[in-house]
């Protein structure tokens, strides 16, 4: 005694319901956040279309896996200029990235001090460290003025700024100039003395060649004339 809508049992109507509704969707557990917690996460950066196209092109040319890796590479390349302009890096300390294949003396947010720079700049204070070649050529002259340098960029080149005072190269030139003039003066004096000695020897040779012959000819003529006059007197004397 039952129908599709319900059944009667001991005077009690029991309703039968069918579970034909849609199955409840299984919710996935929240995935673990694998990104670093940084300020501004979730924000979108707007850039000109030319810049975006250039980023995409660099991603293909450099063989990066994502555009974010290319932007990170660009930040690494521009980090020296960023440090020179702001004094510190622009990336938070909590930012962690995978190391790239490109070697660079700078890392995001921090500057790597090389061994050569650490040795040469150990007692120089907190200024910018210069390499051995440039440091010795500039510091060896004893110039009184200090200087600072901005790291080089391909589009701007190296920028140097010297404080008041002549550069050491000019000091070297001024110190070497009197010595050079003295050496040249000595050489000129030696050359003039040698020329005067040569002229004296030549004139003495000329005098020795001409004067003795002239005197000999004169003596010969006089002696010849005296002998002739004596013979003539002998001829006129009667015998």
Curated annotation (Swiss-Prot):
Chain spans, region Disordered: 1-39
Keyword set, alphabetical order: Biological rhythms, DNA-binding, Nucleus, Transcription, Transcription regulation
Tissue: Expressed in leaves, roots, and stems.
UniProt GO BP: negative regulation of DNA-binding transcription factor activity; positive regulation of circadian rhythm; regulation of circadian rhythm; regulation of DNA-templated transcription; rhythmic process
GO cellular component terms, semicolon-separated: nucleus
Gene disruption: observed consequences: No effect on the period length or phase of the circadian clock.
Predominant location category: nucleus
Entry's localization field: Nucleus
Zinc recorded as keyword: no
The keyword Cell wall biogenesis/degradation appears for this protein: no
Basic and acidic residues bias spans: 30-39
Signal peptide location: none
Gene Ontology terms, MF aspect: DNA binding; DNA-binding transcription factor activity
Domain TCP: from-to ranges: 31-85
One Pfam family, short name: TCP
Subunit structure: Interacts (via N-terminus) with APRR1/TOC1. Interacts with SPL.
Function: Transcription factor involved in the regulation of the circadian clock. Acts as a repressor of CCA1 by binding to its promoter. No binding to the LHY promoter.
Name of the protein in question: Transcription factor TCP21
Organism: Arabidopsis thaliana
């Amino acid at each position: 005694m039952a129908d599709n809508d319900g059944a009667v049992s001991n005077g009690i109507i029991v309703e039968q319901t069918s579970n034909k509704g849609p199955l409840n969707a299984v919710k996935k557990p929240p995935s673990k956040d694998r990104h670093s917690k940084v300020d501004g996460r979730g924000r979108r950066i707007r850039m000109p279309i030319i810049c975006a196209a250039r980023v995409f092109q660099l991603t293909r040319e450099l063989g990066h896996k994502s555009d974010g890796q290319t932007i990170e590479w660009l930040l690494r390349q521009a980090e020296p200029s960023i440090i020179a302009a702001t004094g510190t890096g622009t990336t938070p300390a909590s930012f962690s990235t995978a190391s790239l294949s490109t070697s660079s003396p700078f890392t995001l947010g921090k500057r790597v001090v090389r061994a050569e720079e650490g040795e040469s700049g150990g007692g120089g204070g907190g200024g910018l460290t210069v390499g051995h070649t440039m440091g010795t050529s500039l510091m060896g002259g004893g110039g009184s003025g200090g200087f600072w340098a901005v790291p080089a960029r391909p589009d701007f080149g190296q920028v140097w700024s010297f404080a008041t005072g002549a550069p050491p190269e000019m000091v070297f030139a001024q110190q070497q100039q009197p010595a050079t003039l003295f050496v040249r003066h000595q050489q000129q004096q030696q050359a003039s003395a040698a020329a005067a000695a040569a002229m004296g020897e030549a004139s003495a040779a000329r005098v020795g060649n001409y004067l003795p012959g002239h005197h000999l000819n004169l003596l010969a003529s006089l002696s010849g004339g005296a002998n002739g006059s004596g013979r003539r007197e002998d001829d006129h004397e009667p015998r």
